[in-house]
Amino acid sequence: IFATGFAQRTIVGKLAPEFPNVKFVLVNVKPDADFPNVQSAMFREEEGSFLAGIAAASVSKTAKVGFVGGMDQPLIRRFGCGYAQGAKYFNAKIDVIANMVGTTPAAFRDPTRGGELAISQFDRGVDVIFAAAGNTGTGVLQAAKDKGRFAIGVDSNQNHLHPGTMLTSMVKHVDTALYEAFKM
């Protein structure tokens, strides 16, 4: 059984001891305790985000890039930190403006708020924004299209959403990791 995200950790922790012959794979989170039938598929999102930061800084004409994260939590902070480090690696004087949408899972489901944060950043001179915010990110991408600026997507190639304004997408290839876990 594959369980994606931190919200699934508790239920897997309850079910794993009850069903010792069932294998569980947690994605993007470690279990609360060690169970022989539970493994985690973890990623180094900060590394891909570092490259996204380099890409953003390399096309920025204002030396201001932005980040919109969904829920303020360690996973999303790793995206933002890697992005900022990559941008500053390319241009030590670049300004990285970052916003988190909220502190609950609802922060991943608010495209209107994502768009508002993106417009605020664009109004401050940002010309590229990386959105690591779930569905909230679609508002960021739409705002970039509307303002004629660049956006960087996440988790899948999002170029088809707004061709011409999508600089790139930071993809972790969760599918490959899950396939490898399935074979174990």
Regions found by a protein language model. Name each.
Residues 1-184:
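A residue-level marker of the well-folded mature domains of exported/periplasmic proteins
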